[in-house]
Amino acid sequence: MKSMIAAILFALVATSLAGYLGYAGYGGPYGGYGAFGFRGVPVGRAVAYSSSIRHPGYGYGLGLGYGGLGYGLGYGGYGGYGLGYGYGGYGLGLGHGLGLGKVW
């Protein structure tokens, strides 16, 4: 149980790190969660992130799972985009986000 909770928290933190690009006029890119578990259940996550009132960042992710391996694509407002990937094991999925954005 502890390992499951730790893995979930890790996934949340990893995907949230990409959101820092939403700061000061960057788009808010987010990658979708990877597959959830060995069955590759598709998991998507909608995220709202804003670190600046004048230039809020936001994005959404779509997850696609297959055989425990999943990929996610995300697009963020104000020119940001991201890619997420994950490997599901022991009924859990870990996701990472990579984001790029442009200044307005």
UniProtKB/Swiss-Prot annotation:
UniProt tissue specificity: Expressed by the venom gland.
Chief place of localization: secreted
GO cellular component, one term: extracellular region
Keyword Cell inner membrane: no
Subcellular location: Secreted
Signal peptide positions (record): 1-18
Highest taxon of source: Eukaryota
Key words, A-Z: Secreted, Signal
Similarity-based family: Belongs to the non-disulfide-bridged peptide (NDBP) superfamily.
UniProt name for this protein: Glycine-rich protein
